[in-house]
Amino acid sequence: MYELNHIIGNSYYIQSPSKMGLVKLNDTDVCLIDSGNDKDAGRKVRQLLDANGWHLTAIYNTHSNADHIGGNRYLQGQTKCKIYAQGIECDITRHPVLEPAFLYGGFPPKDLRHKFLMAQESDAKELTPGVLPEGF
């Protein structure tokens, strides 16, 4: 199901349960928009990158729901890419227990601490216009 689809120019998307965007920055470097729901999604993205000879330089998270940041930790560990998110989304990406805590109103019980509500933490930086590639 993890299929790379060309849109136009240097823009692609990865067909998956939680679609991901991919932008070629040059012949070898790419950035990813969201990273899927877990390390398995990250592994499949890494396979697509390797098959195309691409190096992941950054992940831009649109928001901090677990199905959009779940592959961050795996991909960052494998590629040393930077991860960016805006505002409070950056904080939730760094501290994913906040996602189910907001739902519950306090530290979430075990039933709310699973990969569908709480991704693994990743080292995200604040997304500002200055960190975006030219043309974004």
Language model: regions and residue ranges:
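Conserved beta-strand hairpin/beta-sheet module of binuclear metal-dependent hydrolase folds
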Residues: 2-52
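Intrinsically disordered, low-complexity boundary segments flanking structured domains
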Residues: 1-3, 113-114
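Active-site HxH/HxHxD metal-binding segment of metal-dependent hydrolases
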Residues: 43, 47-136
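Intrinsically disordered, low-complexity N-terminal regions enriched in serine/proline/glycine
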Residues: 1, 11-12, 59, 83
